[in-house]
Amino acid sequence: MISVPDLQLDAKALLRACKLNVFDFDHLVAGQPTFAPYESDVRPAPVMDFTSGFDTWIEQVKTNSPKNLKTVRYKERKLGREQGELRFEWASPDPEVLRTLLAWKSDQYRRTGRVDRFAQPWIVELTDMMHAEKSSDFAGVLTMLYAGDVPVAGHFGLRTATTLVGWFPAYDTEFARYSPGIVHHLQMAEAGANDGLHMVDMGKGGKEYKDWLKSGVLYVAEGRISRPSATAAVHWMGRTPFNKARTIVMDRPSLYRAADRVLKGFGRVRSSMQQQESPNAAVKEPTGAR
């Protein structure tokens, strides 16, 4: 909530004033007085912290995993040698570059059995609006790594004057052997630090690369506030059991790996069925990325 520090409101009165029956939150800054009583789970969100400079951060990354950093730097050089000189673009204004990134992300969602967010036109429209916003305290930042003239990996996120929030990273799977996503993240970190950022918030969630790129953590919460109503009851039945099951899976690496395998298997089957239905066409699902 954007407010003076330590402001505490009656959360249910706030919902009533907003004409809401339910506020289901996730990635909310933990410990806010208004919402803390309704937090059901608090988790660390890894961050890249540049307050002491980029060089200090990269030394921390090296300490976290010297082997990983050495491997990525090798692949970075190999990508440049074999595919063309590397070029990194910070804050691209080009909507066609955004289209490319969203198409990669849609492909990733489908390939891994996840729901394609960009099949929803309103999400694409919202992303476009945020990409166009360029104020000093709020902006959509689109970054792209090129090998020669070919885009290979990118990211779209939101920034304040000092913080970039990680949102949609993706890469072209044709270049997967070079680990272009991690190469991009290292270059994005350097460009962001040079542009005055103090931090990149990578968000909570189970990606191993976050563990060795992080140099600190923030704490974020999820939870639910509701007012007595039929709508709130229906919402509870539809969401709460799922959220609890997801938390159990995320807390147990063996369950997470098993669930991930199942989803990826579903993605392969879905893609195979689409190829059989249209053998001469590229595998594409309807998407709002136009």
Model-predicted segments: where are they?
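Short C-terminal domain-edge/linker segments immediately following a structured domain
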Residues: 54-57, 76-81, 117-122, 132-133, ...
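A general structural signal for well-ordered secondary-structure junctions
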Residues: 20-21, 85, 107, 136, ...
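Serine/threonine-rich low-complexity intrinsically disordered regions
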Residues: 3, 10, 94, 134-137, ...
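Acyl-donor binding region in acyl/amide transferases
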Residues: 1-44, 158-218, 224-225
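Active-site/acyl-donor-binding loops of N-acyltransferases
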Residues: 31-63, 161, 195-257, 262-267, ...
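A conserved beta-strand-loop-helix scaffold within acyl/acetyltransferase catalytic domains
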Residues: 26-49, 53-177, 271-290
